[in-house]
């Protein structure tokens, strides 16, 4: 497991940002996510934990996320946001949609919406409301996410965006239709930092967080 990265600047709010697959918290630092926040006077702390050691079944990762990160943070911060990149974004949406842990907002950079087998099945069924999953299929974290989105929890503020050339864009556009979004940001770029860093900067510039004196 890679070390957790933190930017603690006395913020009243916290954002837990989850790395994507094959990504470490250190990649997020190197890409400029932490320095972009440090350059703004937002009353926001940023923590990037590494949950990859929990394995492919995200039910364990979700339990760890709530027990070790979200629950302690709620005792310390006014508001706790959850976010992630790619697979990390999928885990963040799953945490909210599955009512695993209470969050005050979501920051989703190119959140992985599941394989085409699942998203195509939803489209063939005529939409999410008409689609159904069997008990065995619910062992798949991709399927569980969409099952939870059929009966979503109360809405929270959500920022979501992805690159216009992202190879997973079809699934993300479907996901965006089922999140409480005012709009989904689509920027030049692929499923990489060419899109993710500009999206992160847009999130920080439009975010609801207070400004430090």
Model region roles, listed by residue range:
Residues 96-138, 196-197:
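Hydrolase active-site cap/lid region
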Residues 37-56:
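Conserved alpha/beta-hydrolase
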Residues 1-41:
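Short, surface-exposed "cap/lid" segments of acyl-processing enzymes
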Residues 128-180:
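The feature captures the conserved acid-bearing segment of alpha/beta-hydrolase catalytic domains
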Residues 56-75:
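Alpha/beta-hydrolase active-site loop
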Residues 21, 57-58, 165-213:
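C-terminal catalytic histidine-bearing segment of alpha/beta-hydrolase fold enzymes
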Residues 83-92:
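Gly/Ala-rich beta-loop-alpha elbow adjacent to hydrolase catalytic centers
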Residues 22, 50-55, 113, 191:
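Alpha/beta-hydrolase active-site loop signature
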